[in-house]
């Protein structure tokens, strides 16, 4: 019957016209993991998609113990579902049950201290038990509410062992097979009806605009893509009403994102939505915003599955709201909280901070709409290496969470000052080398723990053998800074910038005092971690001091901030266009030219120069000459990479008029 249906012309017409019906039908023909979407199998536990088949689905009559012995392992959470033979009770439990069965209901409640119902005394004696309001089925109000807020089990729902081990044991192997991550082009080409299906593109507020791959516009017209910024609560505070400050900041942020996507790519403003699944912002509006039959796409860890699950939960809660309208809030509140927790665990796609958790397309119904959760993509081929190297899963979870801009990144937030040639270590995942004798204020809008070293040579030596006292300041184990890390030059800049780390947040960098040299900052990144620099995002999402008073006069540095006029910066095109961000410049290794061999590139050369000067291995003139040669080599690499007439060197003067001349998007 199914074979005839699939090959019939009627079915093919249905498939073309309504994918939201056809795709779930096709997926229902195969047993798949509800968390990651992979097709499951129970033959080989070393192959992807392995799961433990419930005993009731097996055709033989072996007992539970024999089945589990054959399978080789037992999952405690599965036991209630697959248990066939009852477990014999202990004598102590049998005696307890016998005594309990002889007690009245009031004595049972007294035993467990259950004195209250809806905040009032439940009953004083057994006669009062008969006066508790019940419906025609003999159910109390509390029992009815519990029944309403019960997650109904799906008999056909299964989970593969990879997903169960991640969820219950935090156990995983970060391999390409277990966590497949493809490039965007490959993911889009694998979508059914790839040329016409609606696309909803999610991107992360923590690292904007890194989460937007411009190649998406090779597959769709900008007017046909819907963009959703996730984790927006990290940029603006919670929204209470349209008149408070948070709502105004939310509007500023939406205008900024709309300006950027509209000017850069031609995306209409009505195709942009700002959301926070954690805070549950405007979920009803978000549901209306997403077209029926949409494919939800985006980078890994951008929050696709979390958003979908929040929409599913909101739909369930709305359906139940009318049923408990007359029940006191205190009665419903705790039961509803328990329901939410169970819903997140048992319904919808799995949610994880690990990249590549979703392994195949998962069709999901949200009200009358059907959407498809699509595996995330990445432009970094070494992303598995990055996450596999991090010591503990809880560290990944902490770093992915990000920080709040209006707690750590605004102009009045706490900062720390550092002076070059100090090196800032971001838990071993990145090292930022500051130019010599230059002073900077650093605001940390990530969850990185920052440790400062006096120079790059000392940082490299300690990284090879991390002492126990600093172990908690490193997300990875011992490593070789000179040979393992990717090296980059930070393009020249004027004024404040932000160093953005993909998925993790950003570091606000503000130069202080007179500029001592044109030496470039250098950033060393662990393989798989990507970074850019950008203009301070705070200038675009809230009004900031202009540095001029109300008469247009420039203020002095020592003038109080309140004398300044405040203005909101807008992202503009045309002659007023300024690049929002810049890529970093790859640093080519050429150590032999400077120190006569030894390997390790310009990073090692810089460390050698700093170490030699401090330990008097060479005299001051030789160390100074070596450092100058290194800077000249870096200037040459910068100019060659940009292929521009403007030549950056020691004498180049930067100001507000040319501060973006060396930025490349």
From Swiss-Prot:
Chief location of this protein within or outside the cell: mitochondrion
One GO cellular component, as annotated: mitochondrion
Gene Ontology molecular-function annotations: GTP binding
Matches recorded under InterPro entries: G_CP_dom, GTP-bd, Mito_lipid_metab_GTPase, P-loop_NTPase
Transit peptide boundaries: 1-17
Domain CP-type G: 185-380
Main function: May be involved in the mitochondrial lipid metabolism.
Protein family (similarity comment): Belongs to the TRAFAC class YlqF/YawG GTPase family. GEP3 subfamily.
Full protein name: Genetic interactor of prohibitins 3, mitochondrial
Taxonomic source organism: Lodderomyces elongisporus (strain ATCC 11503 / CBS 2605 / JCM 1781 / NBRC 1676 / NRRL YB-4239)
Encoding gene (name): GEP3
């Amino acid at each position: 019957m199914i074979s005839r249906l699939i090959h019939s012309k009627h079915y093919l017409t249905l498939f073309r016209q309504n994918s939201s019906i056809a795709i779930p039908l096709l997926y229902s023909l195969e047993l798949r993991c509800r968390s990651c979407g992979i097709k499951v199998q129970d033959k080989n536990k070393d192959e992807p998609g392995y799961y433990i088949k419930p005993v009731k689905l097996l055709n033989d009559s072996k007992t539970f113990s024999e089945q589990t012995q054959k399978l080789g392992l037992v999952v405690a959470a599965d036991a209630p579902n697959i248990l066939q033979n009852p477990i014999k009770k202990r004598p102590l439990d049998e005696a307890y049950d016998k005594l309990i069965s002889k007690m009245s209901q009031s004595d049972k409640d007294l035993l467990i201290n259950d004195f209250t119902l809806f905040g009032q005394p439940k009953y004083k004696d057994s006669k009062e038990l008969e006066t508790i309001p019940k419906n025609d089925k003999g159910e109390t109000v509390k029992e009815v509410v519990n029944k309403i807020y019960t997650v109904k089990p799906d008999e056909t729902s299964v989970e593969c062992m990879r997903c169960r081990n991640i969820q219950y044991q935090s156990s995983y192997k970060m391999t390409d097979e277990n966590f497949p991550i493809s490039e965007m082009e490959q993911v889009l080409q694998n979508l059914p009806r790839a040329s016409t299906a609606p696309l909803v593109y999610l991107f992360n507020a923590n690292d904007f605009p890194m989460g937007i791959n411009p190649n998406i516009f090779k597959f769709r017209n900008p007017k046909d893509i819907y963009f959703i910024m996730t984790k927006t609560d990290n940029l603006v505070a919670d929204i209470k009403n349209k008149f408070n400050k948070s709502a105004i900041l939310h509007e500023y942020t939406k205008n900024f994102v709309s300006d950027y996507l509209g000017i850069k790519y031609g995306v209409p403003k009505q195709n942009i939505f700002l959301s926070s699944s954690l805070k549950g912002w405007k979920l009803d509006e978000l549901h209306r915003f997403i077209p029926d039959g949409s494919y939800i796409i985006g980078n890994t860890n951008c929050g696709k599955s979390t958003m979908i699950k929040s929409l599913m939960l909101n739909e369930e809660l709305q359906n139940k709201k009318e049923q408990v309208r007359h029940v006191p809030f205190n009665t419903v509140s705790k039961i509803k909280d328990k329901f939410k927790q169970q819903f997140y665990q048992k319904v919808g796609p799995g949610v994880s901070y690990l990249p590549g958790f979703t392994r195949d397309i998962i069709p999901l119904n949200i009200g009358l709409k059907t959407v498809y959760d699509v595996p995330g993509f990445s432009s970094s081929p070494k992303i598995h290496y990055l996450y596999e190297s991090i010591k503990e899963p809880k560290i990944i979870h902490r770093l992915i969470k990000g920080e709040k801009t209006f707690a750590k990144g605004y102009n009045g937030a706490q900062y720390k000052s550092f002076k070059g040639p100090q090196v800032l270590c971001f838990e071993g995942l990145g090292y930022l080398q500051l130019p010599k004798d230059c002073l900077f204020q650093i605001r940390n809008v990530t969850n990185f723990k920052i440790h400062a070293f006096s120079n790059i040579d000392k940082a490299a030596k300690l990284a090879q053998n991390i002492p126990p006292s600093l172990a908690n300041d490193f997300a990875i184990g011992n490593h070789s800074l000179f040979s393992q890390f990717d090296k980059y030059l930070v393009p020249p800049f004027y004024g404040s910038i932000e160093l953005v780390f993909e998925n993790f947040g950003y570091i606000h960098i503000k130069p202080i005092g007179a500029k001592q040299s044109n030496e470039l900052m250098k950033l060393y990144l662990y393989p798989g971690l990507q970074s850019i620099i950008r203009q301070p995002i705070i200038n675009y999402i809230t009004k900031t001091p202009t540095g001029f008073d109300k008469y247009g006069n420039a203020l002095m540095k020592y003038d109080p901030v309140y004398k300044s006029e405040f203005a909101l910066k807008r992202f503009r095109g045309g002659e007023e266009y300024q690049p929002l961000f810049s890529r970093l410049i790859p640093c080519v290794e050429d150590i032999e030219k400077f120190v006569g061999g030894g390997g390790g590139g310009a990073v090692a050369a810089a460390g050698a120069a700093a170490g030699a000067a401090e330990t008097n291995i060479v005299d001051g003139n030789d160390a100074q000459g070596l450092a100058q040669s290194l800077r000249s080599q870096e200037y040459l690499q910068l100019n060659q990479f940009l292929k521009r007439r403007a030549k950056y060197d020691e004498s180049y003067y930067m100001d507000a008029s040319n501060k973006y001349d060396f930025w490349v998007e």
